Amino acid sequence: MSFLKNLFKKKSPTHELFHPLSRSPLTALRRRSEHIKQVYRCPISGKSVEYECPESGFPTHCNRTHWEQDKIHQSLIPKLRQINEDYHDLARPNPLPELLKLPGPMEEDEVVSLLSWDSFFYTRDFPKFQSSRTARHITSLLTYPMSIGAILHKNSPYNLKNGLTPQGLQSLTALRYMLHRPLSAQSTDPRPTRIFVLGATKECSLPPSIWLQGLNFLFPGRLFQLHFIGPEVVVPSKQPNLPSPLSLHFHQDYYHNLHRVGAFEPFDPYYDTFFLPMPLISHPLYSSSWIPTLHDLVSTRCSVWLTSPSSQRTTKDLEVLNNVLKDSIEPLLLPTVNKFASLGWSVDDSNLHEVYHANQEVFGFRALYYNVQNVSKE
C-alpha cells in the first residue's frame, strides 16, 4: 500500500460540500456557471446549455433528454462531482492546515526521492494528510514547482531509459553543474538560476512558500529568479517579502515582445531554462500568438520544458512545434507521464468532456546543436 494511502484516514461525509454551481454559496462558482453557459454548447444538439446536471452540479446540456443520452458525460460524472466538492471544500475556514507545517530546506547531505508523490512526501517528511482530498489540494499547488524541479534535480525520475535523450542529458548536466555545487561554491556565485514561466496564469498566484518547496528547498543554497510572463499574469500590488534565495518577477506581456527589446539578455544554458505549463500552443484561438515566441525561444539556445493535460494535447502541440520550427529543434525529453501531475481533476469550461489532471505529461526541446568536426583531406 502506498505511502499516501497509509496516511489517509477515513473520509468524513461530503454531502455538505456538493452544490449546483448556479446555486453555490461561492460567488466565483456562480460566475463560473454563467461562464460555462456562454462558452459551452450541448454536445448532443449544439444549443446553449440550460440544464444543470443534478449529479455533478455543472450546466451540461440543453435539456434532460440529451443529458440522459450523453454516455460520455455519464462516465465523467464522478470526476466532475469531485471537482465540485473539492472547490467547495477549499472555501471552508482553514481548509489546508498542512500548508502551515510544510518541511523546511534540505540539509546538504539529505537525500530526496523524486520517483513519485509518495516517495517525495515520505523522504521530505511532509505532515500526515487527513484525506485523499487533502492530497489532491496539496498536489494541485505543488505540481507546478515540482514538475520543473523534478526535471532539473540530479535525482530526476527521467533518464535515458525512459524518455530523456542524450541532448536532454547534456542540457541538464549544464544546469545541474550550477544547481548542485557545494554550499561554499553557491555562496560565492551572485548569478541566479533563472526560470522563465511562459503563458503563466495560476502559477503566478501560487504562494511563494509553494515555489520554495519545489525549488530552493531541493537545491540548498542556490539562488533562483522566477519570471512569470504572459498577458494574463496578475502583477501583485505589493511584492511578497521573500527569502533572498528566491525572487519573483511579473511581466504582463507576451514573451516575444520582451525578447525583442532584450529584456533578459544575455542567456546562458548553464543558468537559464524555460518552463511552459500547459501552454495553448495548438489552441486555434491562441496558436498564432505563440509562433513568434517559439522562434525566440530557439534563438536563446536554452532548454525548454513543457507540460500537457493529455496525450492528445501533447500530440497536437508537437505538431505545431514541428510545423513552425521544422528542423531547428531537437528533443530533450520525449513525451512521458509527469511523475508530479496534480492528483486532482480539472475540467475545461469550453469542453466539459475534457477532464484531466493538470500537467499530466511532460516533454522538452532546445535549438538544434550541430557537432562540428575537423575532417582532414587525404
Curated annotation (Swiss-Prot):
Keyword Transferase: no
UniProt keyword list: Membrane, Mitochondrion, Mitochondrion inner membrane, mRNA processing, mRNA splicing
Topological relation to the membrane, as annotated: Peripheral membrane protein
Places the protein is found: Mitochondrion inner membrane
Cellular component terms (Gene Ontology): mitochondrial inner membrane; mitochondrial membrane
PANTHER family: GH20023P, PROTEIN MSS51, MITOCHONDRIAL
Similarity-based family: Belongs to the MSS51 family.
Name by which UniProt lists this protein: Protein mss51
Protein's organism: Schizosaccharomyces pombe (strain 972 / ATCC 24843) (Fission yeast)
